[in-house]
From Swiss-Prot:
Taxonomic source organism: Rickettsia conorii (strain ATCC VR-613 / Malish 7)
One Gene Ontology term of the molecular function aspect: metal ion binding
MTTase N-terminal domain sequence ranges: 3-124
Start and end residues of each Radical SAM core domain: 148-380
Protein name: tRNA-2-methylthio-N(6)-dimethylallyladenosine synthase
Family in the record: Belongs to the methylthiotransferase family. MiaB subfamily.
Cofactor(s) it depends on: [4Fe-4S] cluster
Residues holding [4Fe-4S] cluster 1: 12, 48, 87
Record-linked SMART domains: Elp3
EC assignment: 2.8.4.3
Complex formation: Monomer.
Residues annotated to bind [4Fe-4S] cluster 2: 162, 166, 169
Purpose of the protein: Catalyzes the methylthiolation of N6-(dimethylallyl)adenosine (i(6)A), leading to the formation of 2-methylthio-N6-(dimethylallyl)adenosine (ms(2)i(6)A) at position 37 in tRNAs that read codons beginning with uridine.
Protein backbone atom coordinates (compact mmCIF):
# COMPACT_ATOMS: atom_id res chain seq x y z
CA UNK A 1 0.00 0.00 0.00
CA UNK A 2 1.43 3.37 -1.00
CA UNK A 3 2.13 6.09 1.52
CA UNK A 4 0.73 9.59 1.09
CA UNK A 5 2.70 12.85 0.92
CA UNK A 6 1.11 16.26 1.52
CA UNK A 7 3.10 19.42 0.74
CA UNK A 8 1.88 22.95 1.47
CA UNK A 9 3.93 25.67 -0.20
CA UNK A 10 4.32 29.27 0.92
CA UNK A 11 6.08 32.17 -0.75
CA UNK A 12 8.01 32.48 -3.98
CA UNK A 13 8.13 30.50 -7.21
CA UNK A 14 11.43 28.99 -6.08
CA UNK A 15 9.53 27.32 -3.25
CA UNK A 16 6.96 26.02 -5.74
CA UNK A 17 9.81 24.51 -7.75
CA UNK A 18 11.42 23.04 -4.62
CA UNK A 19 8.13 21.46 -3.58
CA UNK A 20 7.85 19.70 -6.93
CA UNK A 21 11.41 18.44 -6.51
CA UNK A 22 10.67 17.13 -3.01
CA UNK A 23 7.65 15.32 -4.40
CA UNK A 24 9.77 13.79 -7.16
CA UNK A 25 12.47 12.89 -4.63
CA UNK A 26 10.13 10.94 -2.34
CA UNK A 27 8.10 9.17 -5.02
CA UNK A 28 10.64 6.32 -5.53
CA UNK A 29 10.37 5.66 -1.78
CA UNK A 30 6.65 4.95 -2.07
CA UNK A 31 5.21 8.38 -1.27
CA UNK A 32 2.41 9.47 -3.60
CA UNK A 33 1.19 13.08 -3.52
CA UNK A 34 -2.20 13.89 -2.03
CA UNK A 35 -4.18 17.09 -1.62
CA UNK A 36 -5.93 15.69 1.46
CA UNK A 37 -3.85 16.43 4.53
CA UNK A 38 -5.96 14.08 6.65
CA UNK A 39 -4.71 11.00 4.79
CA UNK A 40 -1.05 12.04 4.68
CA UNK A 41 1.72 9.92 6.16
CA UNK A 42 4.21 12.77 5.68
CA UNK A 43 3.29 16.46 5.88
CA UNK A 44 5.79 19.01 4.57
CA UNK A 45 5.39 22.75 5.04
CA UNK A 46 7.69 24.50 2.55
CA UNK A 47 7.93 27.87 4.21
CA UNK A 48 8.68 31.54 3.54
CA UNK A 49 10.51 33.91 5.90
CA UNK A 50 10.55 37.09 3.82
CA UNK A 51 8.08 38.88 6.13
CA UNK A 52 6.92 38.31 9.70
CA UNK A 53 3.35 37.56 8.57
CA UNK A 54 4.59 34.87 6.18
CA UNK A 55 6.66 33.21 8.92
CA UNK A 56 3.81 33.24 11.44
CA UNK A 57 1.56 31.47 8.92
CA UNK A 58 3.83 28.47 9.39
CA UNK A 59 3.18 28.30 13.11
CA UNK A 60 -0.55 28.82 12.63
CA UNK A 61 -0.63 25.91 10.20
CA UNK A 62 1.44 23.77 12.57
CA UNK A 63 -1.16 24.44 15.26
CA UNK A 64 -3.88 23.13 12.97
CA UNK A 65 -1.77 20.08 12.13
CA UNK A 66 -1.31 19.39 15.87
CA UNK A 67 -5.09 19.24 16.28
CA UNK A 68 -5.26 16.84 13.34
CA UNK A 69 -2.58 14.67 14.96
CA UNK A 70 -4.48 14.63 18.25
CA UNK A 71 -7.64 13.51 16.46
CA UNK A 72 -5.78 10.70 14.72
CA UNK A 73 -4.33 9.54 18.02
CA UNK A 74 -7.79 9.40 19.61
CA UNK A 75 -8.98 7.32 16.66
CA UNK A 76 -6.12 4.88 17.13
CA UNK A 77 -4.41 5.97 13.91
CA UNK A 78 -0.70 6.59 13.49
CA UNK A 79 0.54 10.18 13.42
CA UNK A 80 1.96 11.77 10.29
CA UNK A 81 5.63 12.72 10.09
CA UNK A 82 5.79 16.53 10.18
CA UNK A 83 8.52 18.34 8.24
CA UNK A 84 9.22 22.08 8.27
CA UNK A 85 11.24 22.96 5.17
CA UNK A 86 12.24 26.16 3.42
CA UNK A 87 13.37 29.52 4.71
CA UNK A 88 11.66 29.47 8.12
CA UNK A 89 13.48 26.20 8.75
CA UNK A 90 16.81 27.74 7.74
CA UNK A 91 16.28 30.93 9.73
CA UNK A 92 14.83 29.52 12.95
CA UNK A 93 16.30 26.02 13.14
CA UNK A 94 16.07 24.52 16.64
CA UNK A 95 13.64 27.25 17.70
CA UNK A 96 10.96 25.42 15.69
CA UNK A 97 11.30 22.38 17.96
CA UNK A 98 11.06 24.68 21.00
CA UNK A 99 7.84 26.31 19.79
CA UNK A 100 6.34 23.19 18.20
CA UNK A 101 7.90 20.07 19.76
CA UNK A 102 5.66 17.77 17.72
CA UNK A 103 7.59 18.67 14.54
CA UNK A 104 9.84 15.77 13.51
CA UNK A 105 12.19 17.26 10.89
CA UNK A 106 13.57 20.72 10.13
CA UNK A 107 15.34 20.91 6.78
CA UNK A 108 16.79 23.92 4.95
CA UNK A 109 16.47 24.74 1.24
CA UNK A 110 19.89 23.30 0.37
CA UNK A 111 19.35 19.97 2.14
CA UNK A 112 16.16 18.60 0.58
CA UNK A 113 18.05 15.75 -1.03
CA UNK A 114 18.51 14.24 2.46
CA UNK A 115 14.74 13.96 3.07
CA UNK A 116 14.46 10.20 2.35
CA UNK A 117 17.16 9.44 4.93
CA UNK A 118 15.70 11.86 7.48
CA UNK A 119 12.21 10.40 7.09
CA UNK A 120 13.51 6.85 7.40
CA UNK A 121 15.20 7.82 10.68
CA UNK A 122 11.91 9.17 12.03
CA UNK A 123 10.22 5.92 11.03
CA UNK A 124 12.89 4.22 13.17
CA UNK A 125 11.72 6.46 16.05
CA UNK A 126 14.42 9.13 15.92
CA UNK A 127 13.07 12.61 16.69
CA UNK A 128 13.90 16.27 16.17
CA UNK A 129 16.18 15.82 13.18
CA UNK A 130 17.67 18.94 11.64
CA UNK A 131 19.71 19.55 8.47
CA UNK A 132 20.57 23.13 7.57
CA UNK A 133 23.76 22.62 5.56
CA UNK A 134 24.60 25.16 2.83
CA UNK A 135 25.85 22.90 0.03
CA UNK A 136 24.23 24.19 -3.16
CA UNK A 137 26.19 21.87 -5.45
CA UNK A 138 24.91 18.84 -3.57
CA UNK A 139 21.32 20.02 -3.86
CA UNK A 140 21.43 20.52 -7.61
CA UNK A 141 23.46 17.37 -8.23
CA UNK A 142 21.29 15.06 -6.15
CA UNK A 143 17.73 16.27 -6.60
CA UNK A 144 15.93 14.12 -9.18
CA UNK A 145 14.85 15.09 -12.65
CA UNK A 146 11.17 15.70 -13.23
CA UNK A 147 8.78 12.80 -12.64
CA UNK A 148 5.46 14.62 -12.77
CA UNK A 149 4.76 16.86 -15.78
CA UNK A 150 4.61 20.51 -14.77
CA UNK A 151 2.13 21.36 -17.50
CA UNK A 152 2.20 23.97 -20.23
CA UNK A 153 4.39 26.34 -18.19
CA UNK A 154 7.37 24.97 -16.26
CA UNK A 155 9.74 26.36 -13.64
CA UNK A 156 13.44 25.56 -13.73
CA UNK A 157 15.76 26.73 -10.96
CA UNK A 158 19.07 27.96 -12.42
CA UNK A 159 20.49 30.07 -9.59
CA UNK A 160 20.15 30.21 -5.83
CA UNK A 161 21.27 32.50 -3.07
CA UNK A 162 22.19 36.15 -2.89
CA UNK A 163 25.37 38.16 -2.32
CA UNK A 164 23.67 41.56 -2.26
CA UNK A 165 22.78 41.76 1.46
CA UNK A 166 19.99 44.31 1.23
CA UNK A 167 19.41 45.51 4.77
CA UNK A 168 15.74 44.46 4.82
CA UNK A 169 16.20 40.94 3.46
CA UNK A 170 16.80 37.51 4.98
CA UNK A 171 17.55 35.69 1.70
CA UNK A 172 21.39 35.73 2.01
CA UNK A 173 20.98 34.13 5.43
CA UNK A 174 18.35 31.54 4.45
CA UNK A 175 19.47 30.67 0.90
CA UNK A 176 23.20 31.28 1.16
CA UNK A 177 25.67 32.73 -1.33
CA UNK A 178 24.95 32.99 -5.05
CA UNK A 179 25.40 29.72 -6.89
CA UNK A 180 24.59 28.86 -10.52
CA UNK A 181 23.72 25.45 -11.95
CA UNK A 182 25.80 24.28 -14.86
CA UNK A 183 24.40 24.76 -18.34
CA UNK A 184 24.11 21.05 -19.14
CA UNK A 185 21.93 20.40 -16.08
CA UNK A 186 19.60 23.24 -17.00
CA UNK A 187 19.45 22.27 -20.67
CA UNK A 188 18.71 18.63 -19.86
CA UNK A 189 15.87 19.63 -17.53
CA UNK A 190 14.50 22.01 -20.16
CA UNK A 191 14.46 19.23 -22.77
CA UNK A 192 12.61 17.04 -20.28
CA UNK A 193 9.84 19.53 -19.52
CA UNK A 194 9.39 20.45 -23.19
CA UNK A 195 9.11 16.78 -24.14
CA UNK A 196 6.41 16.52 -21.45
CA UNK A 197 4.38 19.29 -23.08
CA UNK A 198 5.73 22.56 -21.71
CA UNK A 199 5.56 25.47 -24.15
CA UNK A 200 6.96 28.02 -21.72
CA UNK A 201 9.85 27.93 -19.26
CA UNK A 202 10.39 30.34 -16.39
CA UNK A 203 13.99 30.38 -15.14
CA UNK A 204 14.17 30.95 -11.40
CA UNK A 205 16.73 32.45 -9.07
CA UNK A 206 16.92 34.81 -6.12
CA UNK A 207 19.15 36.93 -8.39
CA UNK A 208 18.60 35.09 -11.63
CA UNK A 209 20.30 37.69 -13.82
CA UNK A 210 23.50 37.16 -11.80
CA UNK A 211 23.63 33.69 -13.37
CA UNK A 212 27.16 32.57 -14.30
CA UNK A 213 27.00 28.84 -14.93
CA UNK A 214 29.68 26.62 -16.41
CA UNK A 215 28.97 25.55 -19.98
CA UNK A 216 30.71 23.48 -22.66
CA UNK A 217 34.53 23.69 -22.66
CA UNK A 218 34.25 25.33 -19.22
CA UNK A 219 32.94 28.55 -20.78
CA UNK A 220 31.05 30.68 -18.26
CA UNK A 221 27.54 31.45 -19.49
CA UNK A 222 25.71 34.62 -18.50
CA UNK A 223 21.92 34.61 -18.26
CA UNK A 224 21.78 36.05 -21.79
CA UNK A 225 23.97 33.18 -23.01
CA UNK A 226 21.77 30.63 -21.26
CA UNK A 227 18.57 32.10 -22.71
CA UNK A 228 20.03 32.02 -26.22
CA UNK A 229 21.08 28.40 -25.69
CA UNK A 230 17.64 27.34 -24.44
CA UNK A 231 15.88 29.23 -27.24
CA UNK A 232 17.27 26.66 -29.68
CA UNK A 233 15.09 23.89 -28.19
CA UNK A 234 12.39 22.87 -30.71
CA UNK A 235 8.76 23.29 -29.55
CA UNK A 236 9.76 25.67 -26.76
CA UNK A 237 7.78 28.82 -27.52
CA UNK A 238 8.37 31.16 -24.59
CA UNK A 239 11.14 32.02 -22.15
CA UNK A 240 10.93 34.11 -18.98
CA UNK A 241 13.02 34.61 -15.86
CA UNK A 242 12.59 35.95 -12.34
CA UNK A 243 13.67 37.57 -10.01
CA UNK A 244 16.21 40.13 -11.20
CA UNK A 245 18.34 42.76 -9.51
CA UNK A 246 18.89 46.07 -11.36
CA UNK A 247 22.67 46.00 -11.00
CA UNK A 248 22.85 42.70 -12.90
CA UNK A 249 20.90 43.93 -15.94
CA UNK A 250 23.82 43.98 -18.37
CA UNK A 251 23.81 45.16 -21.99
CA UNK A 252 23.73 41.65 -23.46
CA UNK A 253 20.60 40.79 -21.50
CA UNK A 254 18.89 44.07 -22.36
CA UNK A 255 19.70 43.75 -26.07
CA UNK A 256 18.37 40.19 -26.12
CA UNK A 257 14.84 41.58 -25.74
CA UNK A 258 15.21 43.06 -29.20
CA UNK A 259 16.70 40.00 -30.90
CA UNK A 260 15.20 36.85 -29.34
CA UNK A 261 11.48 36.43 -30.09
CA UNK A 262 11.09 33.61 -27.57
CA UNK A 263 12.06 35.95 -24.72
CA UNK A 264 8.75 37.42 -23.59
CA UNK A 265 8.40 41.23 -23.40
CA UNK A 266 7.73 41.26 -19.66
CA UNK A 267 10.25 41.86 -16.88
CA UNK A 268 9.89 41.84 -13.11
CA UNK A 269 12.61 44.23 -11.92
CA UNK A 270 12.27 45.12 -8.22
CA UNK A 271 13.35 48.60 -7.21
CA UNK A 272 11.85 48.72 -3.67
CA UNK A 273 11.98 52.53 -3.32
CA UNK A 274 12.20 55.65 -5.44
CA UNK A 275 14.26 57.57 -2.89
CA UNK A 276 18.04 57.64 -3.30
CA UNK A 277 18.41 58.04 0.45
CA UNK A 278 16.33 54.94 1.14
CA UNK A 279 17.96 52.95 -1.67
CA UNK A 280 21.32 53.65 -0.04
CA UNK A 281 19.98 52.71 3.39
CA UNK A 282 18.65 49.47 1.90
CA UNK A 283 22.10 48.74 0.38
CA UNK A 284 20.54 48.34 -3.05
CA UNK A 285 23.82 49.38 -4.74
CA UNK A 286 22.17 51.69 -7.27
CA UNK A 287 20.20 54.93 -7.36
CA UNK A 288 16.96 55.91 -9.07
CA UNK A 289 18.81 57.44 -12.04
CA UNK A 290 20.49 54.09 -12.72
CA UNK A 291 17.11 52.36 -12.61
CA UNK A 292 15.58 54.89 -15.02
CA UNK A 293 18.49 54.30 -17.41
CA UNK A 294 17.85 50.55 -17.41
CA UNK A 295 14.15 51.09 -18.09
CA UNK A 296 14.94 53.44 -20.98
CA UNK A 297 17.38 50.97 -22.54
CA UNK A 298 14.91 48.11 -22.18
CA UNK A 299 12.25 50.14 -23.96
CA UNK A 300 14.69 51.07 -26.70
CA UNK A 301 15.44 47.37 -27.23
CA UNK A 302 11.80 46.26 -27.00
CA UNK A 303 9.30 49.14 -27.20
CA UNK A 304 6.35 46.98 -26.11
CA UNK A 305 8.06 45.61 -22.99
CA UNK A 306 5.94 45.72 -19.83
CA UNK A 307 7.51 46.20 -16.41
CA UNK A 308 6.65 44.85 -12.99
CA UNK A 309 8.32 45.63 -9.68
CA UNK A 310 8.37 45.26 -5.89
CA UNK A 311 8.03 48.15 -3.46
CA UNK A 312 8.54 48.42 0.29
CA UNK A 313 6.99 51.36 2.12
CA UNK A 314 7.91 52.47 5.60
CA UNK A 315 11.55 51.39 5.63
CA UNK A 316 13.26 52.91 8.71
CA UNK A 317 13.95 56.59 8.21
CA UNK A 318 11.54 57.00 5.28
CA UNK A 319 10.15 60.53 5.30
CA UNK A 320 7.15 61.94 3.45
CA UNK A 321 9.61 63.30 0.87
CA UNK A 322 11.16 59.86 0.40
CA UNK A 323 7.73 58.36 -0.13
CA UNK A 324 6.89 61.06 -2.66
CA UNK A 325 10.06 60.07 -4.55
CA UNK A 326 8.68 56.53 -4.74
CA UNK A 327 5.36 57.78 -6.10
CA UNK A 328 7.24 59.91 -8.63
CA UNK A 329 9.25 56.91 -9.82
CA UNK A 330 6.07 54.85 -10.22
CA UNK A 331 4.40 57.59 -12.25
CA UNK A 332 7.43 58.01 -14.50
CA UNK A 333 8.01 54.31 -15.19
CA UNK A 334 4.35 53.24 -15.54
CA UNK A 335 4.04 49.58 -14.60
CA UNK A 336 1.81 46.83 -15.88
CA UNK A 337 1.62 45.16 -12.48
CA UNK A 338 3.44 45.40 -9.15
CA UNK A 339 3.74 44.01 -5.65
CA UNK A 340 3.92 46.32 -2.65
CA UNK A 341 4.33 45.71 1.06
CA UNK A 342 4.83 47.42 4.37
CA UNK A 343 8.34 47.07 5.74
CA UNK A 344 8.57 44.12 8.12
CA UNK A 345 11.66 43.98 10.38
CA UNK A 346 13.31 40.58 10.03
CA UNK A 347 15.50 39.31 12.86
CA UNK A 348 19.18 39.27 11.98
CA UNK A 349 18.97 41.97 9.31
CA UNK A 350 20.52 45.44 9.73
CA UNK A 351 17.19 47.15 9.10
CA UNK A 352 15.66 45.50 12.14
CA UNK A 353 18.22 47.10 14.48
CA UNK A 354 17.51 50.67 13.40
CA UNK A 355 15.92 52.96 15.95
CA UNK A 356 14.03 55.10 13.42
CA UNK A 357 11.28 52.57 12.69
CA UNK A 358 8.15 54.00 11.07
CA UNK A 359 4.85 53.72 12.99
CA UNK A 360 2.46 51.08 11.64
CA UNK A 361 -0.33 53.55 10.90
CA UNK A 362 1.99 55.63 8.69
CA UNK A 363 3.17 52.53 6.85
CA UNK A 364 -0.45 51.53 6.28
CA UNK A 365 -1.38 54.98 4.97
CA UNK A 366 1.55 55.03 2.55
CA UNK A 367 0.82 51.50 1.34
CA UNK A 368 -2.79 52.43 0.59
CA UNK A 369 -1.72 55.48 -1.42
CA UNK A 370 0.91 53.52 -3.35
CA UNK A 371 -1.41 50.62 -4.09
CA UNK A 372 -4.08 52.98 -5.40
CA UNK A 373 -1.56 54.37 -7.90
CA UNK A 374 -0.30 50.92 -8.87
CA UNK A 375 -3.80 49.53 -9.33
CA UNK A 376 -4.75 52.50 -11.49
CA UNK A 377 -1.73 51.83 -13.71
CA UNK A 378 -2.51 48.12 -13.93
CA UNK A 379 -6.12 48.78 -14.89
CA UNK A 380 -5.05 51.39 -17.44
CA UNK A 381 -2.65 48.93 -19.06
CA UNK A 382 -5.23 46.15 -19.15
CA UNK A 383 -7.84 48.51 -20.59
CA UNK A 384 -5.42 49.60 -23.31
CA UNK A 385 -5.38 46.00 -24.54
CA UNK A 386 -9.11 45.91 -25.34
CA UNK A 387 -9.62 45.58 -29.08
CA UNK A 388 -6.14 44.22 -29.70
CA UNK A 389 -5.21 40.71 -30.78
CA UNK A 390 -2.83 38.82 -28.51
CA UNK A 391 -1.17 35.43 -28.62
CA UNK A 392 -2.43 33.59 -25.56
CA UNK A 393 -0.96 30.40 -24.12
CA UNK A 394 -3.83 28.41 -22.61
CA UNK A 395 -2.55 26.59 -19.56
CA UNK A 396 -5.48 25.70 -17.29
CA UNK A 397 -9.21 25.19 -16.94
CA UNK A 398 -11.29 27.94 -15.42
CA UNK A 399 -13.50 27.80 -12.36
CA UNK A 400 -16.45 26.88 -14.55
CA UNK A 401 -16.77 24.02 -17.02
CA UNK A 402 -17.26 26.38 -19.97
CA UNK A 403 -14.09 28.37 -19.30
CA UNK A 404 -10.35 28.11 -19.93
CA UNK A 405 -7.59 30.49 -18.90
CA UNK A 406 -4.38 31.48 -20.61
CA UNK A 407 -1.76 34.17 -20.35
CA UNK A 408 -0.52 36.83 -22.69
CA UNK A 409 3.16 37.61 -23.33
CA UNK A 410 2.70 40.29 -20.64
CA UNK A 411 1.60 37.81 -17.92
CA UNK A 412 -2.06 38.85 -17.98
CA UNK A 413 -4.66 36.14 -17.38
CA UNK A 414 -7.17 35.81 -20.24
CA UNK A 415 -10.54 34.10 -19.79
CA UNK A 416 -12.35 32.47 -22.70
CA UNK A 417 -15.97 31.30 -22.49
CA UNK A 418 -17.31 28.22 -24.30
CA UNK A 419 -13.91 27.24 -25.68
CA UNK A 420 -12.73 24.20 -27.51
CA UNK A 421 -10.87 22.39 -24.72
CA UNK A 422 -8.32 21.18 -27.26
CA UNK A 423 -6.85 24.70 -27.03
CA UNK A 424 -5.27 23.79 -23.68
CA UNK A 425 -1.52 23.62 -24.06
CA UNK A 426 -1.57 25.68 -27.24
CA UNK A 427 -0.96 29.29 -28.24
CA UNK A 428 -3.87 30.93 -30.05
CA UNK A 429 -4.77 34.37 -31.36
CA UNK A 430 -7.32 36.03 -29.11
CA UNK A 431 -9.18 39.30 -29.54
CA UNK A 432 -9.40 41.06 -26.19
CA UNK A 433 -12.97 42.20 -25.54
CA UNK A 434 -12.98 43.22 -21.89
CA UNK A 435 -10.55 44.25 -19.16
CA UNK A 436 -10.64 44.30 -15.38
CA UNK A 437 -7.97 44.99 -12.78
CA UNK A 438 -6.65 41.44 -12.64
CA UNK A 439 -7.65 39.81 -15.91
CA UNK A 440 -8.79 40.10 -19.52
CA UNK A 441 -11.64 38.46 -21.41
CA UNK A 442 -11.35 37.52 -25.05
CA UNK A 443 -12.60 35.61 -28.07
CA UNK A 444 -10.73 33.06 -30.17
CA UNK A 445 -10.07 34.26 -33.70
Amino acid sequence: MSKKLYIKTYGCQMNVYDSVKMQDLLYPFGYEPTENIEEADVIILNTCHIREKAAEKTYSELGRIKKLQDTRTKQGLSSAIIVVAGCVAQAEGEEIFTRTPYVDIVVGPQSYYNLPELISKVVRHEKHLIDLDFVEEAKFDQLPEQLYPQGTSAFISVQEGCDKFCTFCVVPYTRGAEFSRNVEQVYREALKVVSSGAKEIMLLGQNVNAYHGKGPADKIFSLADLLKHLAQIPNLERLRYTTSHPIDMNNDLIKLYGTEPKLMPFLHLPVQSGSNKILKAMNRKHDREYYFDIINRLREARPDIVLSSDFIVGFPGETDEDFEDTLDLVRRVKYGQCYSFKYSPRPGTPGATRTDQIPEHIKSERLTILQQELMAQQLAFNTSCVGSTMKVLFDRNGKFDDQIIGKTPYMQSVYIQNPNKSLLGKISDVKITKASLNSLTGEIL
